[in-house]
């Protein structure tokens, strides 16, 4: 499995006229499409992982009770196992614009995509997914697995993600996902010390990441009038660090 395969599947959704209403809708359809691929053996949704050393896998296999109440759990949207025994991790984001819009889906009729806005926060969260995928082989899953590649995916009808450099916000300037910019790498600063921003720790990316946006090419009549925005999507490939 590779980035081109994911792009092909998502392009197929557009060709079939699929309009998603939320992230869970998108996640389920992508999981189903991946499961139907010849080279895919299994797909796990919302796979939990824990810090190394939080519990002993052999003890659990032998029936020893364990608790995860006080350890930092993380959930990966999709873990894909291919027929050659390799594992891949996918993190998804589906983000609406700053107002709700109604679309026509070939499969379900009218579909409402509600507003999200907050592009700065959500761009941070997308890059945090990239950071988590870099570190994923330092996590402990219920099965002793090693992730071969990670993929961070964003599908949106908000053009600010692909066009804005966040130039009006010194706080989030380094978190723009705009295409064509210099590769993201290293420490990404958050230029504010206000209390409401303290929950957002600066990210430090090991890899170098550029953002190649793709149009999600629905038929023109999917947009009920010319004021309704189209969709675009981003697939970023991540090499997990060895631990």
Give residue ranges: language-model regions.
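Short glycine-rich, low-complexity/disordered patches
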Residues: 19-29, 42-47, 143-150
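Active-site beta-strand-loop-beta-strand hairpin of nuclease catalytic cores
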Residues: 71, 76-92, 97
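Non-catalytic C-terminal interaction segments of nucleic acid-processing enzymes
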Residues: 144-147, 151, 155-243
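Interdomain/boundary linker segments immediately adjacent to catalytic/signaling cores
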Residues: 1-39
